[in-house]
Amino acid sequence: SGKPVALVAARQGTGHDDIAVSSTAEGFPVLDGVSAFLRGVRALFDYRDFLARHDGPLPTVDVSTAAIGPGEAGALQLLADSGLPVVPVTPVNKETDAVADQYPVVLKTAAPGIAHKSDVGGVVLNIGSEQELRVAYQDMTGRLGPEALIAPMVDDGVEMMLGVRTDPQFGPVLLIGFGGVYAETLKDVVFAVPPFTAAHARRCVDRLRLRHMLDGQRGTPPADIGAFCDAAARFSVLVDTLRDEIREIDINPVIVHETGCTIVDALVVA
């Protein structure tokens, strides 16, 4: 009939019986317990569905000119060189350089060793003039040192995050979830093995507990999930390509707008 057949024993420990051992040796393994059998069937169906997916080709990412530079500026440049949507930043280390072509801007410390800039007063938002920028830079320099970054303010949106950790056995494992200052509190993330397509990234996003937040709440427009998934897929190809050179990457937040998304902060551990 072409239907698959499984040998299942309802009694625990049956796998040690002579008939079970001989059957297994002949290529017909006996599954020990109905629960184990059902889990196995579920896994087989999941694998069947996985093989049946036609997500299309992976994004093309050219890393021939990409370089892993120091600090946040270096991380953002690596992502920008790989085609990801990154906010432009200007590094400064003296007051005379603390100027911008357009306002409002954000000023962030670039002092080494500070992972959470907001916790130490290392981020000043909505700076509206050159005078305000100089005052903010003077204050930040006095507390945290002269290294800083200036970037244009980015439109509001839903704050998401992307990350990767390299497991010694499985290689890079990518994280997708809700980000921003509440990332560690929400802990709403899913994991995926790179590389993958935007369609797979969308399936990951749909598994998040707070997925509905991306659909717009109380009059706010829906977020551009497609743009975020495109960025996640491109990021997955990047980290898979550089798997032997990068141990960790944290991108938080990725601000997902009504149209498009923007990476505003990143850290690379090579």
Regions found by a protein language model. Give the residues of each.
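ATP-dependent carboxylate/acyl-activation modules
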Residues: 1-270
